């Protein structure tokens, strides 16, 4: 820990590969208080395993254990914001929306549906931030 940081206000955000890192890091690191995943939440079958990706996207035999939305569900009960471009050619929007619904069910089950949100924006595989940045600011407010 670092004395100049407020441990109650640590967030993590990233797009694409950064969304991968954010998802997995927030799933296992409880010191991350808010996660903002851009251009990543989907299914492994519809995205990572359907195209040729860089090697750091592959977790051997992961489908024997879980799907991408299962990993994202481990972030609960901490706030999670997900954004997806409706024309993303790497992470198809249909699978992103379906995966979000599955993550939302986790938050509903624990009684905190307001702590997870998704924004689908008009765009490709890019960062948007219009609703996500205010969401993070709200949940990291001192």
Show where each model-derived region lies.
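Short, glycine-/Ser/Thr-/acidic-enriched flexible segments
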Residues: 18, 42, 87-88, 124-125
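Short glycine-enriched nucleophile-adjacent loop
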Residues: 1, 19-30, 136
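Short, conserved active-site loop motifs that form the nucleotide-linked donor/cofactor pocket
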Residues: 10, 80, 115-117
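Conserved strand-to-loop "acid loop" that flanks and positions the catalytic carboxylate
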Residues: 76-91, 121-123
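Gly/Ser-rich "nucleophile elbow"/oxyanion-hole loop immediately N-terminal to the catalytic nucleophile
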Residues: 1-16, 32
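Mobile cap/lid helix-loop segments that gate and shape the active-site cleft of serine hydrolases
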Residues: 32-72, 77, 90-100, 108-112
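Alpha/beta-hydrolase-fold catalytic nucleophile elbow
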Residues: 13, 38-39, 83, 121
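C-terminal catalytic histidine-bearing segment of alpha/beta-hydrolase fold enzymes
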Residues: 101-142
């Amino acid at each position: 820990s670092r004395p100049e940081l407020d441990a109650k206000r640590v967030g993590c955000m990233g797009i694409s590969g950064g969304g991968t890192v954010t998802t997995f890091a927030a799933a296992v690191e409880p010191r991350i208080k808010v996660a903002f995943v851009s251009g990543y939440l989907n299914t492994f079958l519809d995205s990572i395993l359907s195209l040729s990706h860089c090697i750091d996207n592959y977790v051997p035999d992961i489908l024997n254990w879980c799907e991408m939305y299962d990993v994202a569900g481990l972030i609960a009960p901490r706030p999670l914001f997900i954004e997806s471009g409706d024309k993303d050619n790497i992470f198809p929007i249909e699978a992103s929306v379906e995966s979000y619904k599955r993550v939302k069910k986790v938050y509903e089950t624990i009684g905190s549906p307001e702590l997870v949100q998704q924004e689908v924006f008009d765009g490709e595989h890019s960062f948007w931030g219009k609703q996500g940045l205010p969401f993070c600011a709200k949940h990291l407010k001192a």
